């Protein structure tokens, strides 16, 4: 076991426009090379496009998209007696949210040919409808955890 003290959780202040911690987490994951103002611009432009496309509050759509992409279980490799098992574990709510945001943004970054705001808009709308690549990734993780349910006894 580690002898260090456990690190305190950092408090995430809400973003200035929507007053939402979730949007701030999205912006922080979106940021590259310390360019936070660019990340804000991309995020807010994407949310404006979501509002135009759905005629609804974009914050509700973003929350729905992240909720649909959030995994409930994940698998972790555990080495026992010379063989490695994929052990299914429940995901804490903060980690689940972080994974969902990360998956949505990684799907956006893999696509090419359009501005990031357009790609983020498309993926958020897809995830809100319970489709899209981020939701498919969550389903794959759930299937893998279900297939390895027998190894749940080796939980950490």
From Swiss-Prot:
One of its GO terms (biological process) is translation. The gene is rps7. It comes from the Eukaryota. This is Small ribosomal subunit protein uS7c. It comes from Chlorella vulgaris. It is found in: Plastid, Chloroplast. The keyword RNA-binding applies. Pfam families: Ribosomal_S7 (PF00177). Its main location: plastid. The keyword rRNA-binding applies. Keywords: Chloroplast, Plastid, Ribonucleoprotein, Ribosomal protein, RNA-binding, rRNA-binding. PROSITE patterns: RIBOSOMAL_S7. Part of the 30S ribosomal subunit. One of its GO terms (cellular component) is small ribosomal subunit. SUPFAM superfamilies: Ribosomal protein S7. PANTHER family: RIBOSOMAL PROTEIN S7. InterPro entries: Ribosomal_uS7, Ribosomal_uS7_bac/org-type, Ribosomal_uS7_CS, Ribosomal_uS7_dom, Ribosomal_uS7_dom_sf. One of the primary rRNA binding proteins, it binds directly to 16S rRNA where it nucleates assembly of the head domain of the 30S subunit. Belongs to the universal ribosomal protein uS7 family.
């Amino acid at each position: 076991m580690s002898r260090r003290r456990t690190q305190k959780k950092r408090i995430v202040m809400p973003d200035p426009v929507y007053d939402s911690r979730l949007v701030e987490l999205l912006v922080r994951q979106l940021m590259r090379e310390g360019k936070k103002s660019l990340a804000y611009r991309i995020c807010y432009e994407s949310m404006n496009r979501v509002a135009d496309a759905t005629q609804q509050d974009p914050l509700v759509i973003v929350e729905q998209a992240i909720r649909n992409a959030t995994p409930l279980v994940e698998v972790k490799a555990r080495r026992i007696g010379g063989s490695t098992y994929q052990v299914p574990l429940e995901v804490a709510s903060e980690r689940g949210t972080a994974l969902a945001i990360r998956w949505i943004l990684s799907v956006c970054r893999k696509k090419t040919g359009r501005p990031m705001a357009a790609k983020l808009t498309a993926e958020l709308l897809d995830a809100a409808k319970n489709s899209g690549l981020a939701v498919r990734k969550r389903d794959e993780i759930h299937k893998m955890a279900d297939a390895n349910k027998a190894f749940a006894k080796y939980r950490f």
